A protein has these predicted regions:
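N-terminal secretory targeting signals
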Residues: 1-54, 166
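Bacterial extracytoplasmic/cell-wall-associated proteins, especially those involved in peptidoglycan
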Residues: 33-166
Length: 166
């Protein structure tokens, strides 16, 4: 899971090289910086930022569908991202399986073996693996208002009837 930080570092280095190359090629000419930076935001990484086993991918799709309920691709992806955020946080276990089956955490995880996945879950997993939701830094979420535990965490955002916390 620590590969994400490495890839971000490599991507930053590549962008700096491209910028320096552009300066060298254009010399004293004005650089098309506005278009250059706008184009960078639309570039998707060629490799996933998360390297997951087939079992981890299946578990993420199952928990995403189950916990997100009737939510769309984005809602499923937010749930998946919470699990991956926990894998990268030192306060939690390091693997998807360990995070999901950690005592008193994902209480529905015991039912995952019976859960079916959906095309929306496939799309959400692809989006998450390629860094589409890394802005979601949440470690917790809940779908019911008024739970005491959520009051001790920092609110991040709401989506599809779920509140996400850090």
């Amino acid at each position: 899971m620590r590969i994400k930080k490495y890839i971000v570092g490599v991507a930053t280095s590549v962008c700096m090289c491209l910028l320096l190359f552009s300066i060298d090629v254009h010399g004293s000419e004005a650089l098309p910086t506005a278009g250059f930076y706008a184009d960078l935001e639309s570039i998707e990484p060629a490799e996933p930022i998360y390297i997951l086993t087939e079992e981890e991918q299946l578990l993420l799709k199952q928990i995403g569908v189950h916990e997100a309920g009737e939510m769309d691709v984005e809602g499923i992806a937010h749930v998946m991202q919470v699990v991956l955020n926990r894998c990268e946080d030192e306060r939690f276990p390091d693997t998807v399986s360990e995070v999901l089956f950690q005592k008193h955490q994902f209480t529905t995880a015991k039912q995952l073996a019976r859960m079916k996945t959906t095309e929306a879950a496939d799309e959400a997993l692809s989006d998450v693996m390629f860094g589409e939701y890394t802005h979601n830094e949440a470690l917790y979420f809940e779908s019911m208002k008024g739970k005491v535990w959520s009051r001790i965490h920092t609110y991040q955002f709401s989506y599809g009837g779920h509140d996400f916390y850090k």
